[in-house]
Amino acid sequence: MANVKTEKSAKFAWNEENTQQAVTMYQQLINENGLEFANSDGLKEIAKTVGAASPVSVPSKLTSAKAYQKSDKPRKVGGGSSIRKAHYVRVIAKHAIDSGIIKDADDLASLESAKLETLDAVAQLLGVADEVKQAAGE
């Protein structure tokens, strides 16, 4: 089978015209919908309108044009709590050692295979849930 080259699609390149269009659109999006929208879905709209290959290039172009505004609030990466199973097991083991129930924290290491919700219920039952939060830095 012969390899047939088709006509290449025109490559996108930033120029003064599309840069100015992007800056104007960005400022309108901020005024109409707020900074959070402008820095997420707004960047996609701008990329589509000016013909940019990817929305990723838009913030860097807006930055070099001194128009990009960083969001005030930090983006949350990941989800859920910062409390880990290990925090529960450490606190529960510490209390068990202090009470003389076990000699070593390794005796309760298998608790880490339990669900986080189950460990939370046990911590609440033992009255150490707040201590677990402190251990996790919350």
From Swiss-Prot:
Domain of life: Viruses
Alphabetical UniProt keywords: DNA-binding, Early protein
A single MF term (Gene Ontology): DNA binding
Described function: Involved, together with A1 protein, in the second step transfer (SST) which allows the completion of viral DNA into the host cell.
Assembly, per entry: Interacts with A1 protein; the two proteins form heterooligomers.
Note: This gene is part of the long terminal repeats present at both ends of the viral genome and is thus duplicated.
Family that this chain belongs to: Belongs to the T5likevirus A2 protein family.
Record-given protein name: Protein A2-A3
Origin species: Escherichia phage Bf23 (Enterobacteria phage BF23)
Gene that specifies this protein: A2-A3
